[in-house]
Amino acid sequence: MSQQTTIRKLAELVNTPVEKLLEQLAGAGMKFSGPDQVVTSTEKMKLLGFLRRTHGKSDVSVGAVREAPKKITLNRRRLQEVTVNAGRNKTTVNVEVRQKRTYVKTPESEYHTPTKPPIELGDAERVEILRKLEESRQRNLAEQQRLAEVDRQRVEEQERKRLEEEQAELERQKTESPVVEEVPVQSDSNSVKPVSKPISEDRTRALPRAVRPAPAARPSVSRSDDRNSNSGVRHKPRGSHVIVSDEDDSARRFAGQMHLTAAERARRGSNTRGKGGGSHRGATHRGNENSIRSSGAHGFERPTAAVVREVAVGDTITVADLAQKLALKSGDMVKALFKMGVMVTITQTIDHDTAVLVSEELGHKVTRASSSDFEDALLAHTEEVHGEPVPRPPVVTIMGHVDHGKTSLLDYIRRTKIAVGEAGGITQHIGAYHVETPRGVISFLDTPGHAAFTSMRARGAKITDIVVLVVAADDGVMPQTKEAVQHARAAGVPLIVAVSKIDKSTADPQRVKNELLTESVVAEEFGGDTQFVELSAKTGVGVDALLDAISIQAEVLELKAVIEGRATGTVIESSLDKGRGPVATVLVQQGRLKKGDYLVCGTHYGRVRALFDEVGHQPLAASPSIPVQVLGLSGVPDAGDDFVVVDDERLAKDVAQQREAKRRESRLVTSAGNRMEDILAQMGKGENQQVLNLLIKADVQGSLEALKQALVALSNDDIRINVIHVGVGGITESDANSAVTSKATVIGFNVRADASARKIIEANGVDLRYFSIIYDVIDQVKQVASGLLGVEIREEIIGVAEVRDVFRSSKFGAVAGCMIIEGVVKRSKPIRVLRDNTVVFEGELESLRRFKENVDEVRNSTECGIGVKAYNDVRVGDHIECFERIEVARTL
């Protein structure tokens, strides 16, 4: 070979791409413009020394001497997750582990004497060496192909035996299901001959790993050049070791899963690699038998159809919990609710209907969750009342218009004087009494007649057996009388009409009967089924006849109840006593209520510490239809709540707490809805609406409910009554602080503030008002609300002048000669000029004269001259209207 070798020829000799060889020459400090340039032997040795230095070999050929030991520092970083206990929960923390190692290599010159310079080899010797290396490579390749053929035959034999065993097993089972047989990989049965051309890529991937031919080895000048190559695999070809690239290895692992996409193949292939990104040891160096998968291997498939979930939801649920049940992201759930017009966050609560709508919008189904175990246990308790029903006393509710004599009638029956001691002479809460008469025991409920106590009257009609409608003979049918008839009809209870005050000279019982005909209440004498009794609570006339009518009606109804077992009933009224705590007036409807019983009453529970009747006695037990006061509850229950006696306090507490949680969730849903309604309502209104904040405390729950409803009803477009807090009992320090914060007016209905509350109220100037009559509360709140409305500017016409003639003045211009036809015209008041009853100008007077004298006012039927300021178009027949603006206080 000639001494001159081009770069292209050298690249073919060392089996390296021309571009890469040019890069290596450039890295060694030699610049070449093209692959056809000549490379000398010196430049070849310089390139060889550069490659050795690059890969850490001693450059003895160049004669370089290492003065200092070589150091190499390896920095390694690893990311891992550590689970940390944080209280009751666990938190995952990302931790970065950093490792640094330094390796020091001592120069070979310290252990060996300097070697002699290498002998320069000619091109002929170099070609001989390359030829021997090529022959060695061909021998190794032939050996590898022979071993690969042996491995292939062994694998095919194993596959054939396995298929025969599976076929025999399937025949034994005689199943009718279709069987997908695994087809072994077909390969050339001929012996592998020396490869003359590379195997196609598709065929290579289809072969098992042990059968694949190794890629052609590149010829190299020496072993060090083999190490200097950029291949990712650095090992000695020995025995049956097969070099498999990462791409071929990934294809081998999933060669049988034909349904996988290329992206899934890449993803699954990447999952088998180690943390450092390299493949596992031995996966690419040894033909492992276990790693060879059959062509029939099956993988996981992603569902093609939409997944429809069916979840159970109670009355309320938070947005985050609903998203978790539906396996959705909370953000997607909030977005879907926003599209439906519901603005919520992930922590807010939505009701069952909203959950159903949004779930159907997202393609899922929602069912109503079953009742809780506690409620089921409570229901089982109520159904365990056994015994023979026996007759019980009737429960009679006295209803009617205010001041028609309901309480006076009950006083006469009970031989008491309750009406005299009531504030304002009107009843403001339900009174429950039982009276022993010659005709048996009768329980009476006295309801208020004021319009504000509608819900209280409806509650009385719900738990009663008979309604006695009291109508004054001198007043006739009034609005609350009609309302009482509607309540009785809605509750489905019989009605007895008591026409009271017949001792008055203006009494007209016949008028009452005729007016009630319009309400479909027909007396017996008119062919109806309603009993009418005329009486006087003052003289006692007709009271016995009323008791007889009640007894007859009770016998017709055949009222019965079980008097033994656990008691159940209804709360009539409740209050907070300073010395006794929460006090509830209850009416027993089934069973027997005894001292020491555990009972659940709405969201409250407790043990009966004491029982009191209406006169203050402490009975040992209360039978059906007997009202009593109960002490020992955990809080003040709402009027109208049902109570149930249970076995132990644990069950009572669990049921009460669960009910409180449900009520709180419902309240949150309602408040969220109210906030939305407030926002939408305020969008259409200006900022002129005033707000009056109120804090109401009352003696009993029924009065509190009536007060809140009556005061909130006073709101209109100009002012809104906002009740920030209501409660039963005295005004406490926390109530005073709430009033200071919200700038609210405190209303105490039959209650007073304690010393600490009074101190805060006086220090901050809070408006505190005490009341005992509901009329006064409503009137005072109306006055306060009217004061917030401010004043209204109104225009009042005080005089009209008719223009009879027009004069010209050098000083004032056009002057109108007028006759006052109505009222009085004043100089200081504004005026309007009307032409054909249409306003053409509005301004003020510049001059008002009578007989050439300036005057302040001119009265009716008097002539005068009027000069209108900045207006000269006054005509005969116009009217000049004089008016004044006055301020008028606004009222509700």
Swiss-Prot record:
tr-type G domain segment(s): 391-560
Region named Disordered: 165-250, 264-300
UniProt keyword list: Cytoplasm, GTP-binding, Initiation factor, Nucleotide-binding, Protein biosynthesis
Record: residues binding GTP: 400-407, 446-450, 500-503
Compositional bias annotation for Low complexity: 208-222
GO molecular function: GTP binding; GTPase activity; guanosine tetraphosphate binding; translation initiation factor activity
Major localisation: cytoplasm
Pfam families reported for this sequence: EF-G_D2, GTP_EFTU, GTP_EFTU_D2, IF-2, IF2_assoc, IF2_N
An example Gene Ontology CC term for this record: cytosol
Cell compartments where the protein resides: Cytoplasm
Entry's transmembrane regions: none
Biased composition (Basic and acidic residues): 165-175
InterPro entries named among the record's database cross-references: DNA-bd_dom_put_sf, EF-G-like_DII, EFTu-like_2, IF2_assoc_dom_bac, IF2_II, IF2_N, P-loop_NTPase, Small_GTP-bd
NCBIfam families (UniProt xref): IF-2, small_GTP
Family that this chain belongs to: Belongs to the TRAFAC class translation factor GTPase superfamily. Classic translation factor GTPase family. IF-2 subfamily.
Protein role: One of the essential components for the initiation of protein synthesis. Protects formylmethionyl-tRNA from spontaneous hydrolysis and promotes its binding to the 30S ribosomal subunits. Also involved in the hydrolysis of GTP during the formation of the 70S ribosomal complex.
Protein name as it appears in the record: Translation initiation factor IF-2
